[in-house]
Amino acid sequence: SLQFVADQGFMLNGKIRKFQGVCNHHDLGPLGAAVNVSALRHQLELLKDMGCDAIRTSHNMPAPELVDLCDEMGFMMMLEPFDEWEKAKCEGGYHRFFYEPSCYPSVVPAHPDEVRPHAAERMTWAEADMVNMLRHYRNNPSVVMWSVGNEVPTQGSDEGYKVATWLRDICHREDPTRPVTSGMDQIDNALDKGFAAVLDIPGFNYRANRYEEGYHRLPQGLVLGSETASTVSSRGVYKFPATKRAGAMYPDHQSSSYDLESCWWSNIPDVDFANADDHPWCIGQFVWTGFDYLGEPSPYDTDAWPSHSSLFGIIDLASIPT
C-alpha cells in the first residue's frame, strides 16, 4: 500500500521510508540504447548493492523490460514521459506534437475551459501518449508515482498550472491510486503562479535551499527531491586541495572524485541527505544520475572535443563506481 501523508511523509506498506532513488536515462552507455535485459539487470544489481531503491525514468517512457525487472527486484519507480510540453526546449522537440490531434479517439468530451485546442473527436498526442503509458504500467507494482514533466518551460507561463492540472487529471482518471508529480526547476514561478500547488507531490529539481519555503507555502505538506545533487566526478581522479567547489574546470577535462565538486545550479549530495534526514515532510530524493551517459559533460559542456560523457553518474560508463 502507498500513503503520502502531509507533514509525516511517505509510507510503504504502513512504514515510513524515504526514496533513495536515482534518475537514469534509457541508454546503456557504450552498449547503446537498444534494450538489453542482461545489461539492465546488471545496472539494477549495482544500484541495489549501493542501497538504491527507486528509479526515475528521466525523461521518457520506460522499456517494459525495465519495469518488469523493477517488479522482480523490488525497486520503486517514478515514470516520466515528457521533457517539454507545448513550449520548446529545442527545435525538434515534443512541443511540435503536444497539442496536435492524434489518431486516437477522445476518451471523454472536452470541457469548455479545456486547455487543449483540438477538443472533441480525437485525443491530442500528449493525452494519447500519457494514456498509453498509464494503461500499460498501472498494474505494475513497482510503479509508485507518475511524473508529468521535467523542467518544462511552461512553469513560467501564467497558464502553466492549467496544463499541469490537465495532465494530472488524465493520470487520476486512468489510475486513481497513485500521486502525480513534476520535476520543477523554476521554483519562484512554480510557487507564485500556482503550478506547484496543483501537483499531488511537489517535485523540486535541485534548489535544496528552497525545500522549507515550499513546504510552508504549498498545501500538500510534502516535498520530493525529484532531481538532486548533480555532483561531478571522474573515477580515479583526485584534485588537491580537496575543497568544495562549484563549476571547477581543469586542463585534463576531469573532475575530482572526492564528491566535493558540483555545477552552478547544483550541490553536493550531503545537502540532500540532510534535508531527508532532518524533515519528515521531505520524502527523499532521486539523484542525478545513477549512471553516466553520453552528452552533457558539465562543467565542460562546450560542444568541444574531447568531452562527450557526463560526469554526474555515481557509476561511470564502464559500470564502475566513481
Set out the residue ranges of the language-model regions.
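Extended substrate-binding grooves/exosites of carbohydrate-active enzymes
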Residues: S1-T322
